[in-house]
Amino acid sequence: MFDDFVNGVVATVEGMKVGNPDDEGTDMGPLSSVEARDDAIAQVERAVEQGATLRTGGTALEQDGAWMAPAVLTGVTREMDAFKEEIFGPVAVVYSYDSIDEAVELANDSSFGLSGSVWGKDTDKAEQIARRLEVGMAYVNEHGTTKAGLPFGGVRRSGYGRELGRWGFGEFANTKLVRVAK
C-alpha cells in the first residue's frame, strides 16, 4: 500500500505545471527568492546524504528566477535534519506507519506545529485524528485553507497567538487599563 501511495504522489507531483502564477494552468510558482530555493535544495540534498530517498524533483529548474522542481522524499528518519527542520519549499516527505497511534506520535514529534492535515474517506475518523495533532491549524481532506474569519497561527516554535478572525482583533488593539485604588 505504501509504495502504491508514494507512486501516486510522485505521479501527481511530476504532473504539476511549474510556471507563472498568473497563468491559469499553473500549479506552482517560484519560491520567494533564489536564496530560499537554494536553501530548500540544500535541505533535500542533505536529506539524501543522510540516507533519505529522493523520489523526484529537488533541483533548480533551468530558467531565471527562484524556480524549483517539487520534490518527494521517503525514508526520512527522526535522526535526519529533514525530520527536525522546516523545509520552506515544495518538498513532500512521505512516512510509513503501522497504526494510527504511530502516525499521530510521529506527526507530533516536532518542535514545530503550524498546521497539519488528515486525509481519508471516513471524515469522522479523520476528524478524530486531526484533533489529536498538536498544531495550531488542523485540516481534514484539505490543507492550508485561510479565510478572514478563521484563526491563523501555530504552536511551539511555529508561534503563539492568532491572526485573523475574532482571535486576531487583539493583535491590532492597544488596550489601556486605568485603575484607581480606593
PLM features: residue spans?
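ALDH superfamily catalytic-core signature
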Residues: M1-T77, L106, V140
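Conserved C-terminal structural/oligomerization subdomain of aldehyde/semialdehyde dehydrogenase
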Residues: E14-V18, A60, W67-K182
